[in-house]
């Protein structure tokens, strides 16, 4: 006896499942109605479905739609083009009956789509397309049963119910009246119906998050308990979910079954291949609702959204510093451990971050691949180009919350904030002098070492600071880039221009503590103070 509200189907002999039995072909119009995220989901589901069917060892040539997906083409078909693919699904009752009598092989078919993906489909245009296709092309075996009265649930038990598009490998007598999907157990149907109702009766008592299935709640609880029951026999690494362990095993076996047809790169997971293919297609389906910025992966979007929320869930156990991205925390922890796993093959210099090593390689090659579109200046690092471009745009996105002063680079803001906090974390090992910026410490240490690494190619004179060399070079070139707006006089140094402008403004910021006399230059005040010392 079926449970109330559940509609049993007549038992059917077990049949082989082919890709054609489960494929959903889309027309050009239907494909156009899907958004980027839904197209990505469709690609993922179709490729995974085909992979599961192929794993059963069933014969058959590769479907056209799979070839289209592998080539990165839009997987829609012209009207009538999918007839061959769909004819086995739309046969009449006699053809269905003959097929069922001839095909009684017992196959254990794996699930073609996960519960999460199925839940996502119900909330998307892709589900709507499937529902419309289902309504117009039921693909059922007509029944001669007469129409009888409706039951208490508004259903007529005598009316033939459309079978789902998938040909079940086992008896599935319970059908969903919303979408026509069939199930072997009434409990599975009840779980499925929560997709349509939105009911989530299983609530986590720790964080309050709700789920439609108790099994999903059980997996979620392991986040709070830290339980990882699935352990790798090779290396002992443990996982919360069995599917994660299965994927991890491929690291040891070296298996990479999913290959990119564009560049030949292979991946252990289909999802990684799909993500990689967006590099070639330029697709960025994950859009931030706050600023509109788009990303090619959902995890990158989640990390980005923390910029808006200020959330920093990853904390360092050593110093308590928090980070919005786990990768940044791992890089930071190397400050405490001193680990520098990335070594330059040219000079042997080691780095704590791989991206810094890649940038360092440009020092040896001389490569400067990043060019400014405004002035043509080239840079070895993309981040340096971005900072440079703000000179042209005059953008200063990093503002101090204390005084409102804005900066071009985030590192400059960090250094500036130490003016307010008084923090000077960089200490000289020779004399104990402390500095707020690491660059200032490096420059100071040259006083003790006598190092002057910046040499003039014209006269051979050397300097401890690069900025001093740049100013010196203007002696040879005669360049005077700093011009007074009041009188037009030009200067080779910005500091000299500032001093000169005080002639026009009358500003005298340097005052003598003895007699109160003021001067427009600090050097003039020093000379004046010697008068008091002589007296």
Swiss-Prot record:
Single GO biological process annotation from the record: regulation of DNA-templated transcription
Gene3D superfamilies in UniProt: 6.10.140.140, Classic Zinc Finger
Cellular component, GO annotation: nucleus
Subcellular location(s) per record: Nucleus
InterPro entries: C2H2-ZF_domain, KRAB, KRAB_dom_sf, Znf_C2H2_sf, Znf_C2H2_type
GO molecular function, one term: zinc ion binding
KRAB domain boundaries: 17-88
CDD domains, per the entry: KRAB_A-box (cd07765)
Extent of the signal sequence: none
Keywords, alphabetical: DNA-binding, Isopeptide bond, Metal-binding, Nucleus, Repeat, Transcription, Transcription regulation, Ubl conjugation, Zinc, Zinc-finger
Zinc fingers (C2H2-type), renumbered ranges: 174-196, 202-224, 230-252, 258-280, 286-308, 314-336, 342-364, 370-392, 398-420, 426-448, 454-476, 482-504, 510-532
Keyword tRNA-binding (UniProt): no
Zinc-finger as UniProt keyword: yes
Top-rank taxon, per record: Eukaryota
Principal location listed in the UniProt entry: nucleus
Cross-link (Glycyl lysine isopeptide (Lys-Gly) (interchain with G-Cter in SUMO2)): 99, 200, 396
Summary of the function given for this chain in its UniProt record: May be involved in transcriptional regulation.
Family indicated by similarity: Belongs to the krueppel C2H2-type zinc-finger protein family.
Name recorded for this polypeptide: Zinc finger protein 250
Organism per entry: Mus musculus
